[in-house]
Amino acid sequence: MFMGEFRHNIDTKGRMIVPSKLREELGEQFVLTRGLDGCLFGYPMKEWANLETKLNDMPLAKKDARTFVRFFYSAATECELDKQGRINIPSTLRNYAALTKECVVIGVSNRIEIWDEARWQEFSEVAAENFDEIAENMIDFGL
């Protein structure tokens, strides 16, 4: 399970060190793709396979399902850690998530998320302001 918040930098070649606390669970190879809310999602290969099964079961006749699957898969890329524990984030993904230099990597249960630091700060502030109300709404999901 992934959890925690880690601050890292992306170098001029688009490389970022994956936090050591997340590396073992993530594995040497994993999939990185567009996420929601303007961040990137990173999945261990096993989790990606589980997600693939669910995505492939989506109804092809539904336009939203087709759009989501296309957008999600078209940016997906297999990443491999180098000897220094870094990954190279493709420019298309860096542009999507507005990643320049300072970023935040967070663990979110079965995946990691990579955020531009300013975007994460803004998201966190809004989430903190509304956390009690959001928590109350989670009752509908059995929490």
Curated annotation (Swiss-Prot):
PROSITE patterns named among the record's database cross-references: SPOVT_ABRB
GO MF annotation list: DNA-binding transcription factor activity; transcription cis-regulatory region binding
Pfam families per record: MraZ (PF02381)
GO cellular component: cytoplasm; nucleoid
Transmembrane intervals: none
Keyword DNA-binding annotated: yes
Locations listed in the record: Cytoplasm, Nucleoid
Record carries keyword Iron-sulfur: no
GO biological process: negative regulation of DNA-templated transcription initiation
Ranges of residues in domain SpoVT-AbrB: 5-47, 76-119
Alphabetic keyword roster: Cytoplasm, DNA-binding, Repeat, Transcription, Transcription regulation
Quaternary structure annotation from Swiss-Prot or TrEMBL: Forms oligomers.
Similarity comment text for this entry: Belongs to the MraZ family.
Descriptive protein name: Transcriptional regulator MraZ
Lineage, uppermost ranks: Bacteria, Bacillati, Bacillota, Bacilli, Lactobacillales
